[in-house]
Amino acid sequence: MIVPVSPVLPVVQKGFRMQHPGKLLGIFLLFGCLVIASAAKAEAVPASGTMEVLFTPWDDAEGAIVRALAKARHSIHVQAYLLTSRPIGNALLDARARGVVVEILADYALLKNGQNSQIPQLAAAGIPVWLETRYAVAHNKIMLIDATDADGAVITGSYNFTWSAQARNAENLLILRGNRPMQRRYLSNWRRHRAEAQPYAAQPTNADGTSP
């Protein structure tokens, strides 16, 4: 729903003479138009499908992600701030081995400065990876499974794809299934981020994911 925004003019103190009031009014009108235009881009998605709700450390969110990835038939799209979980990394490798197209977007700074990332190992196995460099923090934690299918899934929440998110942190995770309009919106946003990200050049790795 688009809500009209009325420009609010500043309060002028008694005895103060405003310079160029026409220009100031124009600025506020332009600002109001920009707000309305931005709201016009918002799109409500009808509720449908099912929702699996998990809270760590009590629920097995990591296991739920691994099981969902195991059911992927043709595509998995990942947006990761952190991806250090070996079970999740192995599930992505297994998916690729059975012919599923797996593609990953990752935060550049965390990959550069962090430890135990699964990204080098995944890239070395042939999974395409792009690094997000445009933003201060690429903080999305999203997985899209068979996003163009009627029974596809969106995985999202505060949950990073890490051991700590499962065992030490208080996190939430949603697995939303069977909402094609929502899946398409997430996939469109994923592709928008990929278009401005930088391809990751895979480096040789040891079996444990470290550099030789």
Residue ranges and their predicted role:
Residues R67, K71-P128:
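Primarily the HKD phosphodiesterase
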Residues L82-R86, Y108-K112, Y135-V137, D149, ...:
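Solvent-exposed loop/turn segments at secondary-structure junctions
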Residues H77-A80, E103-D107, W130-L131, L144, ...:
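Structural recognition of the beta-strand scaffold that forms the well-ordered cores
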Residues M1-V11, P21:
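Short, low-complexity, charge-dense intrinsically disordered segments
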Residues D146, A150-P212:
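Signature of lipid phosphatidyltransferase scaffolds
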